[in-house]
Swiss-Prot record:
This is 3-ketoacyl-CoA thiolase. One of its GO terms (biological process) is fatty acid beta-oxidation. The gene is fadI. It comes from Shewanella sediminis (strain HAW-EB3). The active site is at 99 (acyl-thioester intermediate), 392 (proton acceptor), 422 (proton acceptor). The lineage of its organism: Bacteria, Pseudomonadati, Pseudomonadota, Gammaproteobacteria, Alteromonadales. GO terms for molecular function: acetyl-CoA C-acyltransferase activity.
């Protein structure tokens, strides 16, 4: 069996990334305060269809993801179909793979094209940290069920008397891993300590990310991939990411206190991605259908891989496991790549993965390889800035990375690019794209 991955349909058509689009990414409770992930998802898909001048009725499948699920609309994909003028018979379903969610939705649509089931599909993801499901305590939830079944006033009163005042308090969504009880920030701290990632190096990476993102926006490179979003009550709009420190100075980072280990920690708010609202999407087609419709795709999927590791230690090391799989399936080595886009969940996590890419010991002990994945050339790495600057709406980051690297490669005249991300649950994702 060949190690190479054939990302084509039966006719030999490649999977074309026709275009990609996203909303601006906004910090929690700012520009998108009160706007749900569903509304942002409909917003970006509608705008992408409009810009591509594609009849919505031609979309055969939509796979969309969300991490912070809303009980009122658990199948965000189906609701987007119903709210964007697509045929009501359009196949639509939702996925969730933590921070790798829109990598998963992209792969699902790509595989539908590869099998010949469809020719045209949309993938993406959206998340809101400003509109979240607020829960109730376990005791109150139990009591509410019992109250629904109670028949007499006396039975109902007895149930209510079991509750204390603290049982009535709202319960916000959990930020910790279900399996371990550890937050992502605590895991980033663990990785910083384990791999001797200094505070200064974390600050420097964050400063680099914000500085490059500022340069990218000022150069106009994101205009074609970020829409202007008009938000209710439609008296204002946002057309630029609002987390970027446009006047970033390295000295300013040193003033911040550690966020997760106050006494001995090195991870700060500035070296962590903030809670963010946003949505993104990509339009995928078989190569022949894209060309028949007159499109010049921004890229093609060359290979992809997912990985999973233990959650108790190094949980955010996913890129170091998924990347060698994607490279092997593409028949490539790290040095063959033109650009590398790695999700910067935390500066510490990013630097730890970069360190492991170049580690022969890690390759031998964890990957069963006789050579390291490869040393990362910083002239190829996150050249437009990364998630530390842009922000991280969990389900939207994957398709943000894919679109961004494809368009940057297009500006440079073509080449190959790696996109990779860690994700909660010890998950990892990697996708290699090629651009002509």
């Amino acid at each position: 069996m060949s190690d190479r991955q054939q990302v084509t349909n039966a006719r030999g058509d490649r999977i074309a990334i026709v275009t990609g689009l996203r909303t601006p990414f906004a910090k929690q409770a700012t520009a998108f305060h009160g706007v749900s992930a569903l509304d942002m998802g409909k917003m970006v898909v509608n705008e992408m269809l409009s810009r591509s001048e594609l009849d919505p009725k031609q979309i055969e499948q939509l796979v969309y993801g969300q991490v912070v699920l809303m009980p009122a609309a658990p199948n965000i994909a189906r609701e987007i179909v119903l709210g964007t003028g697509m045929d009501v018979a359009t196949d639509a379903y939702s996925v969730t793979r933590a921070c790798a969610t829109s990598f998963q939705s992209t792969v699902n649509v790509a595989e539908s094209i590869m099998t010949g089931n469809i020719e045209i599909g949309i993938a993406g993801g959206a998340d809101s940290s400003s509109v979240v499901p607020i829960g109730v305590s376990k005791k109150l939830a139990h009591a509410l069920i019992d109250l629904n079944k109670a028949r007499s006033f006396g039975q109902k009163l007895a149930i209510i008397r079991r509750l204390g005042l603290k049982d009535l308090l709202p319960v916000p969504p959990a930020v910790a891993e279900f399996s371990t009880g550890l937050s992502m920030g605590q895991t980033a701290e663990q990785m910083a300590k384990t791999y001797n990632i200094s505070r200064a190096d974390q600050d420097a990476l964050a400063h680099r990310s914000h500085s490059l993102a500022t340069e990218t926006w000022n150069a106009g490179h994101l205009t074609d991939e970020v829409m202007a979003a008009h938000v209710p009550p439609y008296k204002s709009f946002i057309d630029r990411d609002n987390n970027i420190r446009e006047n970033s100075t390295i000295e300013s980072y040193a003033k911040l206190r550690p966020a997760f280990d106050r006494k001995h920690g090195t991870v700060t708010a500035a070296t962590s991605t903030p809670l963010t609202d946003g949505a993104s999407a990509v339009l995928l087609m078989s190569e022949s259908r894209a060309k028949a419709l007159g499109y010049d795709p921004i890229g093609y999927i060359k290979s992809y891989a997912f990985s999973a590791i233990d959650v108790w230690e190094d949980m955010l090391m996913g890129p170091s496991y998924a990347t060698p799989l994607a490279l092997k399936r593409a028949g490539m080595e790290l040095e063959d790549l033109t650009l590398i886009e790695m999700h910067e969940a935390f500066a510490a996590q990013t630097l730890a993965n970069m360190q492991m890419f170049g580690s022969k010991k890690f390759a031998a002990e964890k990957l069963g390889r006789n050579r390291a994945i490869g040393e990362i050339d910083m002239s190829k790495f996150n050249v437009l800035g990364g998630s530390l600057a842009y922000g991280h709406p969990f389900a939207a980051t994957g398709t943000r990375l894919i679109t961004q690297v494809c368009r940057e490669l297009k500006r440079r005249g073509g080449g190959t690019g790696l996109t990779t991300a860690c994700a909660a649950g010890g998950l990892g994702a990697a996708m290699i794209v090629e651009v002509e």
